[in-house]
Regions:
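ATP-dependent carboxylate activation and anion-phosphoryl transfer catalytic cores
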Residues: 40-45, 160-238
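Active-site nucleotide/adenylate-binding loops and adjacent lid/helix of ATP-dependent enzymes
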Residues: 29-110, 114-116
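Short small-residue beta-strand/loop micro-motif enriched in glycine and branched aliphatics
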Residues: 22-23, 81, 152-154, 209-213
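Phosphate-binding site of ATP-dependent enzymes
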Residues: 88-169, 190-197
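Conserved N-proximal alpha/beta basic substrate-recognition cap immediately N-terminal to
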Residues: 1-50
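A glycine- and small-aliphatic-rich helix-loop capping segment at beta-alpha/alpha-beta transitions
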Residues: 9-20, 89-94, 219-222
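Conserved beta-strand edge residues that scaffold enzyme active sites
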Residues: 2, 27-28, 54-56, 114, ...
Length: 238
């Protein structure tokens, strides 16, 4: 989230000439900003849903209609699904904007994606197997991520060989497009026609024993110590 993942800490470390793992200042800041990330992906032809920037002058009725009648509202630069809301009415859209605006001056609204949610880890240039996330919530929100015992993770994710190759290619392209390096995690969902849509890149994913990057690493035979070594090796090889 803000501070540790948006380039702030990275900038301080650069100023102090202290080496660190992961992406640099610019890439961290870009990845943290969902609006700028999505604009870049759209320019590059990478799959990501269209969006609107919400303000107090927004026409809530027209905007929700343009989003297909259902929307996910989120602060542009927050982590852990903080400030996000799922909406189905113009009034809810306005209320969701007010909630998100407490966390960020830029608030975006995307069409609501109701397909499967996946995350793909990248470590030292290697794309790890995708993980499918199944949350017993309206969406994979803060509680589902950190507190719920009802959130399930599947690795392998159940995708076909061709679809697994596709999601890995999209994830690596999105990661590289932002200038990210060493390691990270790319979040993706499927839309109503089962096409992958990029959500965001996490440049400092969780690294506890039950986090998703270690889970993906374990699927290819890397234990936690080996995973940490690969991340350090990626940084030292630069």
């Amino acid at each position: 989230g803000p501070g540790g993942e948006d380039g702030t800490v990275q900038s301080v470390l650069d100023d102090l000439n202290i080496p660190y793992t992961g992406s640099g200042v610019t890439s961290s800041a870009l990845a943290m900003d969902k609006k700028r990330s999505k604009e870049l992906w759209q320019e590059m032809g990478l799959p990501t849903s269209h969006f609107f920037v919400l303000t107090k002058e927004t026409d809530w009725i027209k905007t929700l209609h343009a989003l297909g009648g259902k929307s996910m509202v989120k602060p542009a630069s927050e982590g852990s699904s903080i400030g996000m809301s799922r909406v189905t009415t113009p009034l809810q859209l306005q209320e969701a904007w007010a909630i998100a605006a407490e966390f960020d001056t830029t608030v975006i609204a995307e069409p609501l994606l109701e397909g499967n949610e996946y995350t793909v880890a990248i470590v030292n240039g290697r794309v790890l197997p995708s993980i499918r996330i199944s949350a017993n919530h309206e969406f994979y929100n803060y509680d589902a991520k950190y507190y719920s015992d009802e959130t399930s993770y599947f690795c392998p994710s159940g995708l076909s060989v061709e679809r697994e190759r596709e999601i890995q290619q999209i994830s690596l392209a999105a990661f590289k497009s932002l200038g990210c390096k060493d390691w990270g995690r790319v979040d993706i969902m499927t839309d109503e026609i089962d096409q992958f849509q990029l959500l965001e890149v996490n440049t400092v994913p969780g690294m506890t024993s039950h986090s998703l990057v270690p889970m993906a690493a374990a699927a290819v035979g890397l234990d936690f110590d080996q995973l940490v070594f690969e991340i350090l090796k990626a940084s030292c090889d630069e």
